[in-house]
């Protein structure tokens, strides 16, 4: 890249962009605005960085979040001064809570134009509170050699902090004085004459950042676990960048200890079922049977990452209070139950690699009870759902788990979508890759995140309800810049189905207007306005035919109209019955 010496702003911005490129940046999502002009031009001019313009800042931030979820590397977000950066806030929160690396560059007016009603100016310093891993205000652009060196080194540190010790957000506030456009002047003549580009950027791309995994010995820990036959492993919400290795590690620990693995639908373990002979997918339903819940009380729990979505599981653990060992290498407190816990600051992969199979432990009656119960409940669920011809919301996740092409990335929205997956997602060997926004568990940015995941990726799928999609329908504006394919499975039950499962559903007249909040939107017309293909699904066979194979390009919506109240009644009636076999 040629450094742009036309003026001090173009110099500053082009050095910033080239430094980030050398560190590994490939994508920048840019929202329109005047104060960010130097940054916009520098990113747009760089041949090795994809600069994607997106109008809506909230949508843009979740789109960037999706791209970063997929790659595990920082994505840059650029916006102008004023309230523009505030629209990034929900995505900043989600990125922090789910450990996604984002590098946010908010352009700002210089210090002399603040606190004096200069226009489009707010206090942007520490705009995102305590959510960033690191945040600072960069100096006003300067053509002095020492300041250019400062910029480079600050960017190196910012990049590192977005990845270590845990992935997350870094916010850089960047003030610019006019001229904002690349109007030539003589301010940069001196440094241009002496500037050695290659020497300035030498070895930036060779930097090795410290690993977030520490090597520890477990000789004293593993024998403690082996003392207990009544133990379980819980594989919670997780997005691994190497899902097969992650699942193999869990299976290795499970076979070493002869413990069943309670596998969350948002963990890859259900999609690599052959690796783990002791996989339990129906634990939420099993634990609704009070007799089984009592007989299956564990003496020890090994929790990998966060707890699953299941409220039944959480309540059971809270009541029984077994000692829990939590495997987590991000340094967080993952004990929302405030039980007797010990955190192991390592990864499951490292832990599994430390195991040595010196002697074989025989299967316990406790393990057999879990596995036998799983087979019975699984069979009942599968037979029940197979026999249902009407468009039942709960059947959709079950069908997807058997129908999508192998290795399909699937983004599962919050509220009822994630819970139906938890209840009914069938163990399989199709290596599906689950994605989700379970950091803060909101419905913000659902569509935009899914588009970010699918961008330049293989054909992907999103499972969502109508309210989550409507909350982010501006994401459809990304269509013209989107490269790839996304199929949206839209469960349209005209409102928030999850509230039908809560006690508030009994309280009219408040419930329908203030909680269920039906929007009565014609999604066919909405899709037409955005230029999106729309299909109204009439039966299961039509849905299956449209899901495999998936198209290679474009966005389409497959809408299933379901009955919110009848589906809720079906769940309330059947969830407990499944474990009574």
Swiss-Prot record:
Its cofactor is Mg(2+); Mn(2+); thiamine diphosphate. Transmembrane segments: none annotated. One of its GO terms (molecular function) is manganese ion binding. Binds 1 thiamine pyrophosphate per subunit. One of its GO terms (biological process) is phylloquinone biosynthetic process. Its EC number is 2.2.1.9. Homodimer. Catalyzes the thiamine diphosphate-dependent decarboxylation of 2-oxoglutarate and the subsequent addition of the resulting succinic semialdehyde-thiamine pyrophosphate anion to isochorismate to yield 2-succinyl-5-enolpyruvyl-6-hydroxy-3-cyclohexene-1-carboxylate (SEPHCHC). Belongs to the TPP enzyme family. MenD subfamily. This is 2-succinyl-5-enolpyruvyl-6-hydroxy-3-cyclohexene-1-carboxylate synthase. It comes from Gloeothece citriformis (strain PCC 7424). The lineage of its organism: Bacteria, Bacillati, Cyanobacteriota, Cyanophyceae, Oscillatoriophycideae. The gene is menD.
